[in-house]
């Protein structure tokens, strides 16, 4: 494994430099350094400030690829200070962004030279490219001007630029009636799952271990629901999203208790969207779907991730392809007319032919939307923790696969409506939601674009309070551990009350 050291004179832009280098060397062991040491590295970078420039130097002890021929080099990126920022930049936030963009532009050019390759999303290391595109358009730029900015300033490929601009415009149309100033959305988390997937890093807990305490969890959650509704009185609730985990691990009477409480506390009138992520096919039953159907739920998800049985077995999803089809048909039979299906590309052992097989079977089911995720292996996932066990597995994702998913979505009458990126994504690609007309997931857009507050309830819930028209975001975290959430529910409520009081 390649070993890379990055020496920082100070911590300015440390995260951005690290993430961009990691994107070019995804398999490398990368160390951040704050003083010179004796350790040996295959490639060493140093980042230091020199008056109105940042100087980035590199040196390596051996070639890391055939394209890398130079052993040493240096680049500089001009920066602005408050004194010399005579270009209309008024605030510290904008000044920092300008300097960050300049450093990443120069570093990206160096990394392209070193490795002989480019990245589809250029020097963007954040997770919300469409938010960047939307900001440009809302500032008054024409589509062509925003596209040129993304290509020339951020070095995004023409294909990804077109995707971001297309999605930004569709998001604007979908959100045109949402009140950002007075409205908010509600997320309710159910952290239990029938089993934990190989790639999962979310706060999910095996149902078999926790099934004797699910009543306690629902009771604590209902208490948080009631108290939060009082805090938000006078504000308009736009969307509700019940996710997880797997919400349908709850029994029918627990589902009814939760949804009764939400309705009594917040009311269901005037909602733009109400989603329940039914999720894993092995947890979906007629009784549970009928219970959900008693409430004004407008959208559900049935999530196979793949329609290849051998892959399902490898990743620890203890259901069959046939169960996915049965759950989907059952939902249609019961009258659900807006069903999403989540898919993952880049799963272990899957090549383009297996992805094609999945897409063909999904096409036959004819969902109203699909969300295509590129596999991202987080630190907390079993796939990463026990990576030596899985090192012989292949993880294939490429532009051809991404093009195939888009082509299939278009053939099914769907267009892209939201996208986001994650760290450590296979192929450095993206997650894209596709939907038919009037079937897009509004909550999905709102949480990505950070246009309005998201109030999150349940274990592991992370509320986002939006200040200054999205210029500042503050998070309010609930504890992740289920036992702690139950025992410390009063503390979670007070934590939320204090934060919301400062926002209101």
Stretches found by the model and what they are:
Residues 189, 301, 370-374, 444-445, ...:
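Beta-strand scaffold of nucleotide-dependent catalytic cores
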Residues 115-118, 138-186:
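N-terminal [4Fe-4S]-dependent radical SAM core
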Residues 204-404:
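Conserved non-cysteine loop/helix-boundary elements of the Radical SAM core domain that shape
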Residues 1-143, 152, 221, 437-504:
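Radical SAM enzyme core and accessory elements
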Residues 56-58, 188, 302:
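Short beta-strand motif preference
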Residues 166-167, 199, 276:
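Key residue(s) within conserved catalytic/signature motifs
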Residues 30, 34, 380-457:
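A C-terminal junction/extension of Radical SAM enzymes
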Residues 181-216:
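Canonical Radical SAM [4Fe-4S] cluster-binding loop centered on the CxxxCxxC motif
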């Amino acid at each position: 494994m390649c070993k890379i050291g990055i020496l920082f004179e100070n911590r300015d832009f440390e995260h951005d430099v690290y993430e961009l280098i990691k994107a070019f060397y995804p398999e490398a062991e990368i160390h951040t350094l704050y003083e010179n040491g004796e350790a040996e590295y295959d490639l060493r970078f140093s980042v230091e400030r020199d008056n109105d420039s940042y100087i980035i130097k590199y040196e390596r002890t051996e070639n890391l690829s055939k394209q890398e021929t130079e052993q040493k080099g240096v680049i500089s990126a001009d920066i602005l200070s408050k004194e010399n920022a005579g270009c209309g930049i008024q605030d510290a936030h904008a000044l920092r962004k300008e300097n960050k963009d300049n450093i990443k532009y120069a570093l990206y050019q160096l990394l392209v030279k070193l490795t002989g390759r480019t990245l589809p999303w250029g020097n963007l290391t954040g997770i919300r490219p469409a938010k960047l595109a939307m900001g440009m358009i809302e500032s008054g730029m024409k589509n062509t001007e925003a596209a040129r900015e993304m290509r020339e300033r951020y070095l995004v490929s023409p294909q990804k630029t077109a995707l971001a601009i297309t999605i930004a415009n569709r998001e604007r149309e979908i959100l045109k009636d949402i009140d950002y100033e007075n409205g908010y959305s509600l997320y309710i988390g159910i952290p239990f799952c029938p089993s934990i997937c190989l790639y999962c890093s979310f706060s999910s807990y095996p149902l078999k271990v926790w099934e004797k305490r699910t009543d306690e969890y629902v009771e604590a959650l209902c208490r948080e629901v009631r108290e939060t509704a009082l805090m938000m009185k006078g504000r308009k609730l736009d969307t509700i999203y019940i996710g997880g985990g797997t919400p349908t691990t709850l029994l029918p009477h627990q589902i009814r208790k939760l949804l009764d409480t939400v309705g009594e506390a917040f009311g269901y009138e005037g909602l733009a969207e109400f989603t329940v992520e039914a999720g894993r096919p092995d947890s979906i039953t007629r009784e549970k779907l009928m219970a959900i159907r008693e409430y004004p739920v407008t959208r559900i998800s049935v999530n196979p991730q793949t329609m290849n049985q051998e892959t399902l077995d490898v990743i620890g999803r203890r259901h069959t392809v046939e169960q996915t089809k049965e759950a989907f048909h059952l939902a249609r039979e019961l009258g659900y007319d807006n069903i999403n299906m989540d898919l993952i590309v880049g799963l272990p052992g899957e090549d383009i032919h297996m992805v094609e097989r999945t897409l063909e079977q999904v096409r036959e089911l004819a969902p109203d939307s699909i969300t295509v995720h590129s596999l991202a292996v987080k630190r907390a996932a079993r796939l990463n923790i026990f990576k030596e066990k899985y090192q012989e597995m292949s993880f294939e994702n490429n532009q051809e696969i991404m093009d195939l998913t888009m082509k299939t979505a278009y053939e099914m009458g769907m267009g892209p409506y939201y996208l986001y990126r994650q760290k450590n994504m296979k192929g450095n690609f993206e997650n894209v939601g596709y939907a038919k007309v009037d079937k897009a997931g509004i909550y999905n857009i709102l949480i990505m674009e950070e246009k309005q507050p998201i109030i999150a309830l349940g274990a592991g819930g992370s509320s986002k309070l939006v200040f200054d028209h999205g210029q500042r975001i503050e998070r309010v975290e609930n504890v992740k551990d289920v036992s702690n959430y139950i025992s410390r529910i009063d503390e979670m409520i007070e934590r939320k009350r204090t934060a919301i009081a400062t926002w209101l």
